[in-house]
């Protein structure tokens, strides 16, 4: 087993600044300086993309402290069209946030340009815990899960 620590999750955006603004406004994330502007042979070699050039930022994930993992939002200067988000598409699917009030958090997402994917659901899990959750999207269609876990039913 390797010695590892979680570092970041990457989202490729159509407009990195607008997407970063959304995550700052809705979830209170903060940009971790410096802003990134990468291009050249090292980026091309590492990504396997000829002529790769990107800009963006890392945003501190909420509730994890100054040395915690980040959400990395980058925008390539050119690239293929995005695939539509779908809850059953193979690969990385969504990012989840624990929130104290799912309906209020969902409204904050909508107010900042996000959209509805599904309904708000409350269910009891196999281990007896209750969770209220829903899927929404950010303004670029990336799926976000909002969840509120209750104590175990006694």
Regions of interest found by a model, annotated:
Residues 40-45, 79-84, 154:
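A short, acidic/glycine-rich surface segment
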Residues 62, 74-76, 149:
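Generic beta-structure capping elements
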Residues 58, 76-79:
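Amide-forming acyltransferase catalytic core, primarily the GNAT-like/NAT-type
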Residues 6-8, 90-94:
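Eukaryotic phosphotyrosine signaling hubs
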Residues 1-3, 87-88:
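Short, flexible turn/loop "capping" segments at secondary-structure junctions
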Residues 12-67, 104, 127:
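Core segments of cupin and vicinal oxygen chelate
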Residues 2, 11, 33-34, 71, ...:
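Vicinal oxygen chelate
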Residues 23, 72-75:
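Active-site-proximal beta-strand elements of phosphoester/diester hydrolases
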């Amino acid at each position: 087993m390797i010695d590892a620590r979680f570092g970041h999750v990457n989202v490729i955006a159509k407009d990195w600044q607008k997407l970063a603004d959304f995550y700052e406004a809705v979830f209170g994330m903060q940009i971790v300086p410096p802003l990134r502007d990468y291009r050249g042979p090292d980026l091309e070699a590492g990504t396997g993309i000829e002529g790769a050039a990107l800009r963006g930022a890392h945003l501190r994930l909420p509730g994890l402290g100054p040395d915690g993992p980040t959400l990395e939002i980058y925008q390539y200067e050119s690239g293929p069209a995005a695939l539509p988000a779908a809850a059953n598409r193979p690969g990385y699917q969504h990012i989840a946030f624990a929130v104290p009030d799912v309906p209020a958090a969902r409204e904050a997402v909508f107010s900042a340009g996000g959209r509805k994917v599904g309904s708000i659901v409350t269910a009891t899990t196999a281990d007896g815990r209750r969770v209220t959750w829903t899927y929404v999207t950010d303004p670029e269609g990336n799926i976000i899960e909002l969840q509120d876990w209750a104590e175990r039913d006694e």
